[in-house]
């Protein structure tokens, strides 16, 4: 019963917050402000309601006056919430196209300039790469889940190389981010089983994509995967 109440609160609070954000956007025309609301209003309330504590490590490694392509592992549907909370920038995501069918969420995602990928289309990848590179050239912040799906076991899956090409095309650094604990607070198959716990968000050192030692797409993908994997290793 408690989990059902948590779910009802989460859905109601999210829907209400989105409506408020859309009204604010109509007044201010400031999509970045709407995105920042995810970090200072939506995420903290939802985590408190879930009994989850979020610990952020590594913010000092990043110059937040610049824009980046962030790449993160994917454990749970609350990963986006954790990233909004941890990264102090107006963050846009690449979402699967199925999210366009979710009421309220689709309105917010479109209004804030999120990108969408049709995973069943062979041509979609090239189009999204161009869109992502264009977004990064505009100075926006973008986050990808290069595993392509949520990990059911929590183990890090291989990264798909294609979309990291956007960082090379735009000349922006890639910041690896490791999420640890999201899958325990809200498991992949546990929509009604929210559990209290600790979520750690570890932010890695930016990876350069320009200069004499600049990596190609495959090398960049391997470096990002290795960095995330290292941050997921148990700490003594």
Each predicted region: which residue ranges?
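Non-catalytic C-terminal accessory region of glycerolipid acyltransferases
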Residues: 126-236
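Canonical alpha-helical transmembrane segments
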Residues: 45-54
